[in-house]
Amino acid sequence: LACQAYIDPGDVILVEAPTFVQSVEIFDMFEARCVGVAMDDNGLIPEDLERKIRQCHPKMIYVIPTFQNPSGRTLSLERRKAVAELAAKYDVLVLEDDPYRDIRYSGEDLPPIKHFDTTGHVVMAGSFSKIFSPGSRLGYVVADTETIQHLVDVKSATNSHTSMLPQILCAEFFKRGCYPAHHQM
């Protein structure tokens, strides 16, 4: 959806090296050019990210900050702040793909990159599939109102809607307060 909304053929997307192979396949479908950003045990390296931003002038930065796929690394707190700051400094959209944030059962729970976004450059995407119902293909987006409306317009123009039954079940799951007990299992 983010690609449909923001990516044009030839646009550069900075990605962690390595990154989730299906994301690269989606970016390829939109004829974007992926450029890898180096990582270490604390996730992507901000100095390399800034260097690549200056060299490549990307349209988007794609990052999986928590339990990164395929490495399993988690982006440190300081680096989460740095990503948000660099996005604002260079006016680059960050797609924060954070489907695994709610399956942390030990260690420090870190705020998303979106938490440090003061300029609207970060779009955070999460998933209910990992915590509620695998295969339900339900997710959510956290972004400013203008971005949300743009994404809704693009989704409406390209896909009538996601199946209603999983949406209703997920809504009831949260409305009835089932999530806290489920999350602690």
Predicted regions and their residues:
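Short strand-turn motif at the edge of the Rossmann-like AdoMet-binding core
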Residues: 64, 98-100, 128
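Residues that recognize and position ribonucleotide moieties
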Residues: 42, 93, 141
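Short, intrinsically disordered, charge-balanced linker/junction segments flanking boundaries
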Residues: 10, 59, 179-185
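Conserved core of the PLP fold type I
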Residues: 1-90, 102-103, 108-116
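Conserved short-loop catalytic and cofactor-binding motifs
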Residues: 37, 68-71, 154, 158, ...
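Conserved core segment of the aminotransferase class I/II
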Residues: 118-184
